[in-house]
Each structure stands twice: as structure tokens, then as C-alpha cells.
């Protein structure tokens, strides 16, 4: 349960990271069930606190951002995501919202295939483009690869412009054969059929896609000029053009029929040719669909009725610890192999040591393992009645399994704070160069990856020893680009002290805390625990993190400070802040703006403003976008100055000119 706006913003960041890995990297970090639970908690918080909703929330957007591997291509009509329902009562509530106004509505029910959504554009009967869903507005152009999918027609008997949409999948049988080939060739195995389908569709070599035996199963249309009366009629038309028909498609009239259809699919799930993770329910009558419309993310006339997670019993035979990029330690259980949904499972996440203790999970326990959404397994609970005396307590590690440094143990999470830990180095450097840290132009994720691969850097100190010939070894680097990056790295020397503190990436210490620390001078990190606790806004966890971080990285920090020679203050920034109309003002942003609220918040904070989430008599300015809601009324009640986006931009521009 999310209890504060801080937890809400952290949840958004975490879910967006999970989505990036799932959609863009073909990598599932958590199970579908865990993601769904976290997502539903986010959604519940937003329903109770609509004024806090952020534009970058996963509830406000669809799918993924297109990567750089393929050209971006816009859809003629947006591709939407579906809202999920998880049980009979949620389905009943969803149906009632529709049937209350449209009692004659019927529903098309079909299997929800776990694959990659694809949009096919036909003009004058010819396939002209194939684009992945991406963020719903644009995706990756994969036309050449799509043409190698056997059941995608290159020509259809329809002369108008039409977008035909569906799911790219690989059958269970072909998935098993593909993984056997990869095993024999000493290549890494695909985790599941969805990852295999996604990776195969996004190959730079179309010949590889051709060998993967992908299939395209249509589920709808985008832009077209046909006059269908029903969704079922639309699907029948697609099949008449030469596309594959959807198996187990039914037209249902009420809740009882839908439930019967759903449970039939669950029974048939194991023998189905491809992996399923639910049933799609769509209002059949297109006039009702039109009247129901859409939310910001999804159609109101359709939903996905998710399948219950799959469980099996097995035994924990060992535990290993993995180190994440942030330094977080994740315990992973080694299991006696067990087959779930056609996959042999021998590992499952234990999430964190707090959860192990809470669930009383022990080594040699027989446990319930769940593989929801046919993806990553996790341990639900131990079966304590099977304990035979061989069980042992799973102990929290005291040192990092990678670098052997002492770990920071908090109530829930355990962290490696050693900046030189190989598992942390890359992410630490990405943060070091970021906009809110040293802001090194041109030093992004991909460049840092290459620098590591070429063994040119190990930590931040190595950046300042790079030479022109070093950078010329990197992909797509010529003399001008290499020199520009070297200049940017050198320019980052003599930074404001707060920027260098923030660049260190200390757990719980963000931009605001870094600015507070900078007020205490260049030796601030050497202060004692008692001295830190006296600082305004510094709690026990922040202080413990600071003290432990400095203890683990003293030599590195001293060398970095000596090399970069940070300034006690940034006169340019201070001058801009003090001359700003927003300096020391409390500001609230609300409504839909042309840029993410966080971007405006960052600009205003740089001008000395304090950004809060709620309007009160102490608020100085309310910045309003479209659909400002109750905060605007409250601002007027308290006599708060209200600026629209255009007025804000004018003031910001004027400050820039000064």
C-alpha cells in the first residue's frame, strides 16, 4: 500500500524501470503477478489522490518507448493498452458499468496471447509497413522482419488503407526447438516464448527472424474506412483477407457465459499451442464502443481478465545473493527443478531479507513456487508441515558477494555501498554524469558501456585520464565527437560542491540533501553521525547511509575531491536564484502541461523555488495546465497567484535573458 507522495513517486520510477526492461530489453525482472500487484497499488493511490497523478506514471501511458535499434514510425491511429481485471468481483464491476447504460451489449471473448503487439499497414492491398506497439503513438519499424512471418500476407484483397493489428508469438513447440538449438550452439537460452518472439522480431538480420517460425494472430484494426457494425464482423473480415483465425473466440451475453468461457480457457491452457495469460473481453457493438470511449491509457469497452498464477511445490536447496546496479542485494533461492507451464524452474527470487524473515522461509524448506504470467517465478510461502529438522535459517550477508565490502543493512533492503564494486560501477558512472550531478554532455549510457567494454575506465577518476586516442576506439567516434567529450569532461571540473556530493550516488541523499550538506563546507562528509543528525531534515537512515558510505569510500572520495576541486558555492546559480521572482517561493503544479511536471519542477527548483504537492495559504504560485481540477479552486480561495503555462514560460524566458 502506498502511503505518501514520496512512495508514490518511487513506485512510478520502479514500475517504469520494470517496463523498460520488459518491453525494450526483452527482460522480465519481476513476475507478472508482482508487477500487477504494484501497478494496482499505484492505481489505487491515484484514484484517491487524483491531483498527485504524474504524466510519467505507467497508468498514463502505453507500453514502451521506441529504442534506437530501429527507426521510429507513428501509428495512424493510437494503439491502446488494456485494463486488467483479476477476479469475479472485479469483472462483475466492469460489466455493470457497461450493462447499466447498455443492457443489450454483448461481448467478444478470446484468448490473451502473451507475445508482441504489431501494427500492419496496408495501402492499395499491399503491406507497406509493420510497426511494434511502442508507446502507443509510435513504435519500431520492423517491416522487413515481419515479411518473413509466414502467415502475414504481403497482399490482401482490399484496396483501401487499413491498419491490421495482432500479436506476434512463437508456439510452445517451436520455442522448445529453438532453445534446444541454442543450447547445442552454446548460446544463451530464451527465458520464455514472449522474450523469444520479441527478440526474433527485432533482429537486425532478417534471415534470423525467418528461421524463428514466428506467427501473427490478428485481434483488431486501427485506421480504416469500412462500415462494420460489430467487432465480431471486423474480426471475420480480417480472416477473410487471409489472416489466421483466433481459436476459442466466443460471443457472450452476460457474466455467467463469460465466466464459463474463461474457465474453459483455463482448463485448455496447458494444451494450447501458445502461452496464454488471460482472456480478452471486448464490447461487440461498435456504436457502444464509440460512446464508451477511452481513458488516457485504455479503452473503456475492453479489458483483460487475467489468469490465476500457476503454482508448484519444490524444495530450497541453496541461496545465492545477486548485486543490482544500485548496490541492492537480492537473495535468490536455488530449487530442486520443477516444471511450471512447460518451463523447468530451478531458481526463484526471494526479493529481500525482510521478506524472508517475514515469511519465515528457511533453507531446505518445501515451498510454494508461483510462475504468474508464465514468466519469472517467486516463492510464496514455506510449507511448514513438511519440516523435518534439516531446515536452517537463511542469514543476511554481512559482506558483498562480489567485492567483499561490508554491507549496509536497513530494515528492508541490504546494500553494497562500495562505488568500485563491479556490479555497481556502470550505474554509478551513469548517475555521476547525469544532468543533476556533474552534467557531462555526451557521456550517456551507451558511451559508458563502451568505455567499460574497452577497459578504459573502472571508476569516475578514470574519466579524467581519458585521451583522444582512447575515445577514437569507440564505435561512431570521430575526432570532433571525441574532442567534444574530452572538453565536456574537463569542463565538469570545479563543480559546485552540492553537484559533486549528489554525483556520488549516496543512498537516500538526493539533490536537496546534497545542497544542504554543501552549506557545511568541503569537509562535510567527514562529519560524525551526531553532527549529521543535527542537520535539518536528516533522519537516521540518511545519516547511517552517509556515515557508512564515507567509511567505505574514503580514499576514493578524497582523490575525487582533490582532482575536481569543487567550489563551496556556485555564484552563477546563486545569482540566478536570488534575482528570480521564484526564489524562496512555494509552488504547486497541477493539470496537464506540454512538458512533464517534473521538468518544470526542476527548472523552478534551480531558481530557488520549493515545489510541493498541495495548495495551502502558504502557497505562493499555482502553475496550471489543462484540467486543473480542485487545486485551482483552492488556490483562488486562498488568494494564491495563478500562472498558466504560457505565463510561466514567459517569466522563465525573461529570467534567461537576464
From Swiss-Prot:
Keywords: DNA damage, DNA repair, DNA replication, Ligase, Magnesium, Manganese, Metal-binding, NAD, Zinc
Residues at the catalytic site: 112 (n6-amp-lysine intermediate)
Gene3D superfamilies (alphabetical): 5' to 3' exonuclease, C-terminal subdomain, BRCT domain, DNA ligase/mRNA capping enzyme, Helix hairpin bin, Nucleic acid-binding proteins
Residues that coordinate or bind NAD(+): 32-36, 81-82, 133, 167, 306
GO biological process, one term: DNA repair
Domain BRCT: 577-658
Binding-site list for Zn(2+): 400, 403, 416, 421
Known catalytic reactions: NAD(+) + (deoxyribonucleotide)n-3'-hydroxyl + 5'-phospho-(deoxyribonucleotide)m = (deoxyribonucleotide)n+m + AMP + beta-nicotinamide D-nucleotide
One GO cellular component term noted in the UniProt record for this chain: cytosol
EC number, as in UniProt: 6.5.1.2
UniProt entry tagged with the keyword Phosphoprotein: no
Cofactor dependency: Mg(2+); Mn(2+)
GO molecular function, one term: DNA ligase (NAD+) activity
Superkingdom as given in the UniProt entry: Bacteria
Top-level EC class: ligase
Presence of keyword Metal-binding: yes
Similarity-based family: Belongs to the NAD-dependent DNA ligase family. LigA subfamily.
PANTHER family (UniProt xref): CHROMOSOME TRANSMISSION FIDELITY FACTOR 18, DNA LIGASE
Protein purpose: DNA ligase that catalyzes the formation of phosphodiester linkages between 5'-phosphoryl and 3'-hydroxyl groups in double-stranded DNA using NAD as a coenzyme and as the energy source for the reaction. It is essential for DNA replication and repair of damaged DNA.
Name of the protein in its database record: DNA ligase
Organism: Helicobacter pylori (strain G27)
Taxonomic path: Bacteria, Pseudomonadati, Campylobacterota, Epsilonproteobacteria, Campylobacterales
Amino acid at each position: 500500500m502506498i502511503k505518501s507522495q514520496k512512495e508514490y513517486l518511487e513506485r512510478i520510477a520502479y514500475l517504469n524501470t520494470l517496463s523498460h526492461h520488459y518491453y525494450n530489453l526483452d527482460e522480465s525482472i519481476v513476475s507478472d503477478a508482482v508487477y500487477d500487484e504494484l501497478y494496482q497499488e499505484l492505481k489505487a493511490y491515484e484514484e484517491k489522490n487524483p491531483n498527485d497523478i504524474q504524466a510519467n506514471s505507467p497508468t498514463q501511458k502505453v507500453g514502451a518507448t521506441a529504442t534506437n535499434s530501429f527507426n521510429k514510425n507513428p501509428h495512424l491511429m493510437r494503439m491502446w493498452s488494456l485494463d486488467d481485471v483479476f477476479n469475479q468481483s472485479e469483472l462483475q464491476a466492469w460489466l455493470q458499468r457497461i450493462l447499466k447504460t447498455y443492457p443489450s451489449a454483448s461481448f467478444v471473448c478470446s484468448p490473451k496471447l502473451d507475445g508482441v503487439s504489431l501494427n500492419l499497414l496496408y495501402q492499395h492491398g499491399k503491406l507497406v509497413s509493420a510497426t511494434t506497439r511502442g508507446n502507443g503513438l509510435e513504435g519500431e519499424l520492423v517491416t522487413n522482419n515481419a515479411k518473413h512471418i509466414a502467415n502475414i500476407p504481403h497482399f490482401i484483397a482490399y484496396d483501401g488503407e487499413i491498419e491490421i493489428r495482432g500479436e506476434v508469438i512463437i508456439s510452445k513447440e517451436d520455442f522448445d526447438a529453438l532453445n534446444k538449438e541454442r543450447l547445442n550452439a552454446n548460446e544463451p537460452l530464451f527465458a520464455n516464448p514472449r522474450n523469444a518472439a520479441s527478440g526474433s522480431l527485432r533482429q537486425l538480420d532478417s534471415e534470423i527472424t525467418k528461421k524463428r517460425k514466428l506467427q501473427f494472430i490478428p485481434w483488431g484494426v486501427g485506421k480504416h474506412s469500412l462500415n462494420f457494425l460489430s467487432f465480431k464482423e471486423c474480426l471475420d473480415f480480417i480472416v477473410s483477407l487471409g489472416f489466421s483465425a483466433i481459436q476459442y473466440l466466443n460471443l457472450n451475453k452476460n457474466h455467467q457465459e463469460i465466466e464459463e468461457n474463461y474457465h474453459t480457457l483455463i482448463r485448455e491452457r496447458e494444451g494450447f499451442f501458445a502461452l496464454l495469460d488471460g482472456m480478452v473481453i471486448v464490447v461487440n457493438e461498435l456504436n457502444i464502443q464509440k460512446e464508451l470511449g477511452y481513458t488516457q491509457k485504455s479503452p473503456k469497452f475492453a479489458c483483460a481478465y487475467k489468469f490465476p498464477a500457476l503454482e508448484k511445490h519444490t524444495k530450497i536447496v541453496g541461496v545465492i545473493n545477486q548485486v543490482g546496479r544500485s548496490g541492492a542485494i537480492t537473495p535468490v533461492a536455488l530449487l530442486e527443478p520443477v516444471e511450471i507451464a512447460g518451463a523447468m524452474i530451478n531458481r526463484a527470487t526471494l526479493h529481500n531479507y525482510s521478506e524472508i524473515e517475514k515469511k519465515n522461509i528457511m533453507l531446505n524448506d518445501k515451498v510454494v513456487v508461483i510462475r504468474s504470467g508464465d514468466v519469472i517465478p517467486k516463492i510464496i510461502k514455506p510449507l511448514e508441515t513438511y519440516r523435518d529438522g534439516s531446515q536452517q535459517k537463511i542469514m543476511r550477508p554481512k559482506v558483498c558477494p562480489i567485492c567483499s565490502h561490508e554491507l549496509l543493512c536497513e530494515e528492508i533492503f541490504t546494500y553494497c555501498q562500495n562505488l568500485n564494486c563491479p556490479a555497481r560501477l556502470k550505474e554509478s558512472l551513469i548517475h555521476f554524469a547525469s544532468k543533476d550531478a556533474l552534467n557531462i554532455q555526451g557521456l550517456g549510457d551507451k558511451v559508458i558501456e563502451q568505455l567499460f567494454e574497452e577497459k578504459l575506465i573502472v571508476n569516475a577518476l578514470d574519466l579524467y585520464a581519458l585521451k583522444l586516442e582512447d575515445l577514437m576506439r569507440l564505435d561512431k567516434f570521430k575526432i570532433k565527437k571525441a574532442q567534444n567529450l574530452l572538453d565536456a569532461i574537463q569542463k565538469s571540473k570545479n563543480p559546485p560542491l552540492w553537484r559533486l556530493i549528489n554525483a556520488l550516488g549516496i543512498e537516500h541523499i538526493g539533490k536537496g540533501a546534497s545542497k544542504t550538506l554543501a552549506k557545511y563546507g568541503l569537509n562535510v562528509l567527514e562529519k560524525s553521525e551526531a553532527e549529521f543528525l543535527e542537520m535539518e531534515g536528516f533522519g537516521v537512515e540518511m545519516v547511517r547511509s552517509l556515515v557508512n558510505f564515507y567509511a567505505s569510500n574514503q580514499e576514493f572520495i578524497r582523490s575525487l575531491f582533490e582532482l575536481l576541486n569543487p567550489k563551496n558555492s556556485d555564484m552563477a546559480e546563486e545569482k540566478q536564484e536570488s534575482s528570480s521572482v521564484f526564489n524562496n517561493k512555494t509552488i504547486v503544479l497541477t493539470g496537464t502541461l506540454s512538458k512533464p511536471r517534473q521538468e518544470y519542477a526542476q527548472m523552478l527548483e534551480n531558481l530557488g523555488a520549493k515545489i510541493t504537492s498541495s495548495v495551502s495559504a502558504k502557497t505562493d504560485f499555482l502553475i496550471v495546465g489543462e484540467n486543473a481540477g480542485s487545486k485551482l479552486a483552492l488556490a483562488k480561495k486562498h488568494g494564491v497567484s495563478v500562472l498558466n503555462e504560457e505565463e510561466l514560460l514567459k517569466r522563465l524566458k525573461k529570467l534567461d535573458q537576464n
